[in-house]
Amino acid sequence: SVGFKAGVKDYKLNYYTPQYQTKDTDILAAFRVTPQPGVPPEERGAAVAAESSTGTWTTVWTDGLTSLDRYKGRCYHIEPVVGEEDQYIAYVAYPLDLFEEGSVTNMFTSIVGNVFGFKALRALRLEDLRIPTSYIKTFQGPPHGIQVERDKLNKYGRPLLGCTIKPKLGLSAKNYGRAVYECLRGGLDFTKDDENVNSQPFMRWRDRFLFCAEALYKAQAETGEIKGHYLNATAGTCEEMIKRAVFARELGVPIVMHDYLTGGFTANTTLAHYCRDNGLLLHIHRAMHAVIDRQKNHGMHFRVLAKALRLSGGDHVHAGTVVGKLEGERDITLGFVDLLRDDFIEKDRSRGIYFTQDWVSLPGVIPVASGGIHVWHMPALTEIFGDDAVLQFGGGTLGHPWGNAPGAVANRVALEACVKARNEGRDLAVEGNEIIREASKWSPELAAACEVWKEIRFNFAAVDTLDP
């Protein structure tokens, strides 16, 4: 007799196991499943578990050569999504042995691989992952983390201030360096290469690195504060990326930058290891994230990309503003900000957190608020993000009517006023505008900024919202 029975079996016979008790070593995933009509919920959840682990569409004789019970993913719970017709959250447990140690690339290749093109599903979204502590311990994580960064910069008790140099493309290296100098001289802690500044004909990377290093050393000498410029090391190959990071280290600058989604997780982890070994901080930009995370029914939520970044490595990552021009609902944003910074985060569905996550002392990542923010937003940003954040004003610095340095002064005065008011027990959410007005009496730069941006609003509802 034949040792196995050929043919197509329902996935739920093997992969839907509601009685399964999850293990501390399992990777747990919460998928939002939108099926084709007529497919029962158990079959959908089981199909996701199968296609992202050991299953294929038909029975194969080589199944008998391994222990599927040991290696298969299991759909262990399904719940309907409130307010949505025929949409479910499927919870899947993956055994740890399915994944290579220390590889975000391998983890994502399994969990968000071919299954997202599966015909039986109209749409599929990965809402959250629970990374087991045993797997976290195979990663280095952020090169330095929040406390080490503060110690390196000697800056405590307040958020850090940044600015993206604009126009993002087209400046020569010397003019670019001049813009950096003006911002840092005015009181900012950091300036930033835009994510698409790499090494183009109008400004090659080596020239930019040299002029920016000159600018930050000059600003440091004048202000007595440590300054940084995020030198974007992102390149077409890993070798070229590391070459740029090496040159940044030789210049003695404190921080480099990487576009982690367009650059890829393998490149990002490589750079993070180099940065820890060589004392460089690593700023991460999330260009391309909205392609993956903006649609509510398909793709992957940013909280998963944020967890992946903390594993792969980065000291800063862009994380939305709540109040500016880019997508981000308050409760959702605060949920993944906690996932970036804190050591232990409780399950809290009201903030989109599906699983309790223990980071077992993996260093934290500083969230960066950037995109359409200006001095009037300062009280809200200080209240929402607290001290461990970088508040990044591009147009909100460079758009000042008197120039870059006065724009930087306006932001620094507004920030110091908000921190002082908070420390005195004032409510920034209620008294924010009053605090800024009071400060502007003593700072003509801030008064001018207040006048320019007093009418600016980005009143659009977020696309990706919490379920009711």
UniProtKB/Swiss-Prot annotation:
Named cofactor requirement(s) = Mg(2+)
State the free-text cofactor note.
Binds 1 Mg(2+) ion per subunit.
Q: Which residues form the active site?
A: 166, 285
Query: So what does this thing catalyse?
Result: 2 (2R)-3-phosphoglycerate + 2 H(+) = D-ribulose 1,5-bisphosphate + CO2 + H2O; D-ribulose 1,5-bisphosphate + O2 = 2-phosphoglycolate + (2R)-3-phosphoglycerate + 2 H(+)
Binding sites annotated in the UniProt record for Mg(2+): 192, 194-195
Stored CDD domains: RuBisCO_large_I
Residues flagged as site, Transition state stabilizer: 325
- Describe how it is modified after translation: The disulfide bond which can form in the large chain dimeric partners within the hexadecamer appears to be associated with oxidative stress and protein turnover.
A GO molecular function held by the record: magnesium ion binding
EC no. given is: 4.1.1.39
* Primary location class: plastid
Pfam families for the chain: RuBisCO_large, RuBisCO_large_N
User: Could you tell me which residues carry N6-carboxylysine?
Assistant: 192
Which cellular compartments is it found in?
Answer: Plastid, Chloroplast
Keyword Chloroplast set for record: yes
* Domain of life assignment: Eukaryota
Any other comment in the entry?
Answer: The basic functional RuBisCO is composed of a large chain homodimer in a 'head-to-tail' conformation. In form I RuBisCO this homodimer is arranged in a barrel-like tetramer with the small subunits forming a tetrameric 'cap' on each end of the 'barrel'.
Which family does the record claim for this protein?
Belongs to the RuBisCO large chain family. Type I subfamily.
**What is the name listed in the Swiss-Prot or TrEMBL entry for this protein?**
Ribulose bisphosphate carboxylase large chain
Question: Which source organism does the UniProt entry give?
Answer: Catesbaea spinosa
Q: What is the lineage of its organism?
A: Eukaryota, Viridiplantae, Streptophyta, Embryophyta, Tracheophyta
